[in-house]
C-alpha cells in the first residue's frame, strides 16, 4: 500500500505538478544569495531525477516501490527546456502503461498489488481515508531533503526491477490488447456515425468526403440520436482511451501534439488538463485490472461474445438508421419548403410593392368612376383601356368590379340615369377590351343578387342589382336567356317581393324581350297568369298582382302607353353612344354572353365555358355531364323503338340521338322547337339540329311538311340557323345526281317551302351554274320554281323576287333565272299542264321576270 501511494504521488498528479512548479520557480534559486549552497542542492536534485528517469525507462513503475522511495516534490533551482519536460512526460506514461499490463502476471507481487490497491482505493473512498491515498487534485507537498529523495529512488530501483523476458512478454500482450481495443473503438465510432456500411476496396471503413470536407467526420457523432450518443460525453475520456490502446509511435505523436497545444496556453490550464487526464486514467485502470485478472481462454470466449453482440448492435443500428431516414423523408415530404431569409425578405418586399400598386390602381379607377358621365364617357373608357394594357387583366377586373359594385349597389335606390352610365361603361369595355370584362362583372352581380335574395335585405340592394342585370341586357352584354331564367324563378316562388322585381324587370327590358324572343315572353306571361290565378287568394293586396298582369298584357299587345313611367328615350340615346364608341372595335359581333342563371352560379364547379381560355379543373366536362344527363333521361322516357330507329338513321352521337328523339316525340313543330331550344346546345352543337332535321326530312317516304315548318321556325328565330340551312342545301346541290327519288322530291318541297315563307332568299341558288346545267339540276330547278310560282300569292311573289333585284353581286343569278324561266319553264308549259294552269304560270312568270329587272320596270 505504501508503494502504491508513492506511485500515486509520482504519477501525473505528483511528478507533473512538480515539473510545473519547476517551470514557475526554477529561475529564482541561484539568485537567493552569493553562497554556493543553492548550486549543490540543484546538483543533487538533478542526479536524483536522472536516476529516477533511468529506472522508469527500464520498465519499472514509480508506484511499484516499497515504502516511500519515490521522488517527492522538490523546488528546483533552474528552468528545464520544453523538450526535456515532454521527454519526462513520455517516460512517465510508458512506465505507467507497463505497470498496468505487467501487473496481472506478477500475481500478488509488488507491482500488481500496488495497482490493484490503487484501483480499489479509487472506488472505495471510505476504506482508504485512513491512509494518505492519492488525491485527484493534490495539494502542494512538503519539501523533502535532496539526500532522502535520492536514497528512496535508488531503493525503489533496486527492489522492483523486472526481468527482461517478463518485460517483453508483458509488452507483447499489451500490444495485442491495444490492437483489439483499437478495433472495438473503431467499430464503436463507425456505428455511432452510421458509416458501418461504407467500406473501401481493402475492407476498411471510410468517411464520406463531404463529411471530411465540412469537418463533420469528427462532430457528427455528437449529433447522433439514440443510446450511442453517450459514448462522446467527454472528450477527455476519448483521448485517454486512445492513449491506453494505441501503439508507442502513435502515443508519442499524440503526446507531442498535446504538449504543443499546452505550449499555447498558460501554466494553470496545463496543470488542470493534466489532473483531469490523471483522473480519467485512474478510472480506466479499474476496468483494465478486472479484465487482466481473467484467464486467456475466458478472455477469448468473451471476445467472441462481444463480436456477436457487436454484429447484433450493427444490425440494430442499420435498422434504426433506415427508420431514421424514412422518418426524415416523411418529415421533409410533409413539411413546408424551407425559404431562406433573403428570399423571404424579397418576397415580402414584392408583396408590399404589389399591395401599394393595387392601392394606387384602386384609387385611380375609383377617381375615374367618380367623374363618369355621358359627355366624358369616351375619355374615361379610353383611360380604362390603357389601364388594362398596363396592368394584368385579373387585377383590373377585380378592381373595376369592386369599384362598380361599391358605386351601384347601395342601400338606397340608385338614380336610373347614373346606373345606366355605369353599365354602359362595362358594355364598352366588354366590346373593346374583351368579353372577360363583362363576364367577370356579370358573375359578381349574379352571385351578389343570389346571396341577398336568399338571406334578405332591408335596403334596396336587391333592386339595384336587378336593375344592373336588366341594363346589362339592354346594352348587349348578355342575351335574353339569363333574363328569362330569372323571371321564371321569380314566377315559381311568386311572393310580393318577386312580383315587385318582375315589374321592375319588365319595365326596363320588356319590349326588348318581346323583340328578341316573343314566343318565350308569351309563355312567360301565360305561366304568370296561371300562377296569379292560383295564388290570388294568398295576397291581401290584389292591386300589385293586377298591375303586373296589366303590364304583361300591354307587353303582349305591344302597347307602350299602358305601362306607366316607361320612357325608352334614355336607353336609346345611350345605345347610340355605345354604337359610336364600339364601331371600330375588333372584338367581333358575337360578344353577347349566352349563359343561363344556373351556369353562372355553378361556374366554380362546371367552369366558365363562356369565357375563351378560362382555366377550370376538378369536375367532369360540362358537355359530358350534360350528355350523360340527357342520355339517362332519354333511356327512361323514350321507347326502345325510337332508339333503334335513331341507330338505323346513323345518329351516332349523344347529341344527334337526343335531337332525333326530341323531334320524333314532339306533338307539333312548335313543341319540337321549344324542346330543342331547351336542350341548351351551343355553337357547333346547335348546327346538329339543322343537320338532323335535313336528314329526317329527306329520309321520309313521302314529304312531311312538319320538317319544313320546323325549319322555317328556326330560320325566323336567328340568322345563324339560316346560314346553316343554306350551307346544308348547297351540299345537297352538289350531290343531286346521287340522291334517290324520294330524297330528291322531299328536298324540292323543302326548298320551295322555305322560299315561299321567305325563310330563305333566292340567293341560295347563286351557286348554280346556269350555263352548265345537267338534267338533275334542270329538273330540280323546274320543280322548285313551278311550285314557287303556282302556290305563292302575287304580293309575296313580288317580294321574293324583288329581294335579289337590287343587289349588284347577284346580277348573274338574275340573268340566269330569267333565262331559265323563259326557256325551261314556259317552253313546254302547255304540254304538261292545262290551259288555265299554263296561263297562270305564264302571268306569274312575267311578274317574276319584271321583279328581277328592278323596281323601275315593275312600276312601268
UniProtKB/Swiss-Prot annotation:
Report the record's disulfide bonds.
none
As annotated in the record, motif Required for efficient binding to PPP1CA and for targeting PPP1CA to the nucleolus runs over 307-310
**Pfam families in the record:** MA3, MIF4G
- Disordered: annotated span: 1-172, 191-211, 226-339
Residue ranges, compositional bias (Basic and acidic residues): 115-131
**Location (main, coarse):** nucleus
Output compositional bias ranges, type Low complexity. Answer: 152-169
Which residue ranges have biased composition labelled Acidic residues? Answer: 249-267, 278-293, 312-325
**Residues annotated as region Necessary for nucleolar localization and for targeting PPP1CA to the nucleolus?**
1-269
Name where it's found: Nucleus, Nucleolus
Q: What is this protein called?
A: Nucleolar MIF4G domain-containing protein 1
